[in-house]
Design a protein with these regions (language model features):
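Phosphate-binding site recognition
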Residues: 1-427, 442-443
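Structural signature of nuclease core domains in nucleic-acid processing machines
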Residues: 401-535
Length: 535
């Protein structure tokens, strides 16, 4: 049985040491034959570096590594090319000076590797000279592979001015690529984000962005077929250790880890989570182990964001994959490019551009996103969120409003004063998002702001045969009892419960006042009787 390639992104190491390699060379072959300059955006831990490493070995002509793969009999092994691979995870970037020095050191090292002498002094002219000299010395066109091109920018979004300065360094550095067409055989650039104003996307007129092209939607990540064919033995082992039927296991894995897509048709697994699942033989949130992207952390610190994405089922964008502007950071774009949102569907509307439906990929990512944002806004650690949610689940099942109320009070009291001040003008919506997000973490199916014939209810929690209708009220001037009564009356008067009468229906009303909260559970039949008496 081949080994699990955990943490290995070097193609030669996978092949030589009997690790599983999911063959992506068909997409590589098509890409190379159709063009010369490409950009690909994918979230972290999705196989970008392995893809770059595979391209490196292919262009170097290391034929034996590709035996048995799709490309082996199709590639012209009589030609090899000099390769410059620039991995920005190995380039210093704490300020523009360090970035320039690190890039200069990289160029000097490459000059030594290829035994060429450089006389230029500036960074950009030296890079251009390096490419030209390698071409001249070898008599072969040069292949350039740039991995994580955006790291010097998105690692500094907590300091936009510094990020801009690093962007300017990169813009000048990348401009060299435009004037070197005659020296280049192939250029491939990867990153998490697609930043504007870095010259890659404005100056490289012949660049093809394959991020959301259907043809290359499966170039990174594992398909369902990949999972069931390459990892068959590991699936059987997991089925035995978890005592789950094989088909039930596949469904569970799909629900928890599948769902990433860049065309709305082909849905994928993140390799990191799947490999961890097979290694530990436990269903768990491995996405969180990779760490929340600094990009998302910094955005939450510096910008008021629309938290409704936590509870809405869909979000839309039109046209091409959205660019990222340092001057105008957009929360939804961050979530999309970092993998917390994915393309669920593409609606073609000729002659206009496509409309993309965006949503959270799977249960693992949902838990990661909710846990992180709740932790950020309430000062709860990820470790403390899980046990508290389990307790709340018990309180809801038992409809223990006293203990549930205490949990909600704990939640509200943990909100830092600074954040409370920022949201004070829209605190009702903010509280509602926090409470519903917490319920989502409990494993409930949450539907928020559902339109009915008579109006819009705040939220509906469904679990098995239970339907829990939620209504929130916030008013600093009214009493808690008044707000709770108003919420109950609204549910009955507008008939929010009518579509769910085939289920066991309970009502949960929640009233907020400043940082205080009161909640009330009632069975529907009980509330209907009370409503008649109130009238």
């Amino acid at each position: 049985m081949k080994k699990l390639p955990q943490g290995i992104s070097t193609f030669s190491k996978l092949i030589k040491n009997n690790y599983i390699y999911v063959d992506k060379t068909k997409y590589i072959y098509d890409m190379i034959n159709e063009g010369e300059v490409y950009f690909l955006s994918r979230p972290r831990r999705f196989g970008k570096s392995l893809l770059v490493s595979t391209l490196e070995e292919l262009f170097k002509g290391n034929k034996e590594l590709f035996k048995g793969l799709f490309i082996y009999d199709l590639w012209n092994w009589n030609h090899d090319y000099p390769v410059i691979k620039l991995d920005f995870t190995k380039i210093g970037h704490k300020n523009p000076q360090v970035l320039e020095t690190s890039l200069d050191d990289f160029i000097n090292q490459k000059a030594r590797d290829f035994s060429v002498n450089l006389i230029s002094n500036t960074l950009t002219t030296k890079f251009a000279e390096l490419i030209e000299q390698i071409h001249r010395k070898t008599g072969k066109e040069v292949v350039i592979l740039i991995d994580e091109y955006d790291k010097p920018i998105n690692n500094h979004l907590d300091d936009i001015e510094l990020a801009k300065k690093n962007r300017d360094v990169l813009r000048n550095f990348y401009q060299v690529l435009k004037g070197n067409d005659e020296n280049l055989r192939f250029l491939f650039i990867t990153g998490i984000t697609k930043f504007s104003k870095t010259s890659i996307f404005s100056d490289l007129n012949n660049l093809t962005d394959i991020t959301i092209q259907e043809k290359y939607a499966k170039i990174c990540g594992y398909t369902q077929n990949n999972l069931e064919s390459y990892f068959k033995e590991y699936l059987l082992e997991l089925s035995e250790s978890t005592e789950m039927e094989y088909e039930d296991l596949l469904l569970a894995i799909k629900k928890y880890y599948n769902g990433y897509s860049w065309d709305g048709k082909n849905f994928l697994y993140n390799p990191f989570s799947i490999l961890k699942l097979f290694y530990t033989k436990k269903f768990a949130n491995y996405w969180a182990e990779t760490g929340t992207p600094k990009l998302l952390v910094d955005l939450l610190k510096t910008t008021n964001v629309d938290l409704d994405i936590l509870i809405k089922k869909e979000y839309e964008f039109k046209g091409t994959f959205p660019n990222f502007e340092l001057e105008n950071l957009d929360f939804h774009t961050v979530l999309l490019q970092t993998g917390y949102l994915t393309i669920k569907n593409e609606i073609l509307r000729p002659p206009n551009s496509s409309l993309y439906i965006i949503g959270i990929p799977n249960k693992e990512v949902e838990e990661s996103l909710f846990s992180y944002i709740l932790g950020f806004y309430t000062n709860f650690s990820a470790e403390s969120i899980e046990p508290m949610t389990k307790k709340m689940l018990t309180y809801i099942y038992k409809q223990d409003e006293t203990k549930l109320q205490k949990s909600l009070e704990t939640l509200l009291h943990k909100i830092p004063n600074l954040i409370y001040g920022e949201f004070k003008n829209e605190i009702e919506a903010y509280y509602k998002v926090l409470v519903i997000s917490w319920l989502q973490l409990l494993g409930f199916d949450i539907e928020s702001e559902i339109m009915t014939l008579e109006g819009r209810l705040d939220a509906l929690v469904k679990h098995k045969d239970l339907a829990l209708i939620l209504e929130f009220k916030y008013d600093d001037k009214k009493s808690f009892q008044t707000m709770l009564n108003e919420a109950e009356n609204q549910i009955i008067k507008r008939g929010y419960y009518k579509p769910y009468q085939n289920m066991n229906i309970s009502i949960l009303t929640v009233a907020f006042k400043s940082r205080e909260v009161k909640c009330k559970f009632k069975l529907l039949n009980e509330l209907l009787k009370e409503y008649k008496n109130r009238k």
